[in-house]
Amino acid sequence: MKRIVLLLATLGICCWAGAQEHLKFKNIPIDGSKKAFVEALCQNEFHLVNDGDFGAALSGRFTGKTVDVFVMPTSEGITSRVAVNYPSPDNWGNLRLDFYTLLRSLSFKYGEPVELSQEFQLPFSDGDGRELEALRRGRARWYARFVSPEGTIHLVIANNPMTQQPAINLLYEDALNCRRQDELNSQDL
């Protein structure tokens, strides 16, 4: 009898672990081949800009803005991460407003962030008129991290490497597929 109970408990745990869902982007699970994920985004009015072994770049509308999206697969070709790069606004007020709008929306969906930083380093401060300069010089940290059972979402204001202007970036990391990549990497270490 004990063996039957133990077997049923083990099967229940295995079924529960296998039932964990994937993080979603645009209501599309961050899973499956890069090609299939990109095709699903293209059906959601995104346009493929570039596709390569290390990922795919797309352009489209997200949260009311035209953004660049990068789909990143594991070494096995399974989609594991999606990055969103927003356009650089022309002033600090608009950038801060966009950050707070996304922070509020993400908090509504995923709960309060597990990590939140909104700070400037001396000699810069919020309200001094030099906030964008502080961000360009790496003297500010505006960041939030949300964690759910399905994965992690990072919201950050960072310098856009193409324009050298501060902009908002989002990174969605699927827990299951990132864990699988970590397991594969650990075999090499």
Which residues are covered by each model-predicted region?
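Sec-dependent N-terminal signal peptides
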Residues: 4-16
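Mid-chain, structured segments of secreted extracytoplasmic proteins
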Residues: 60-105
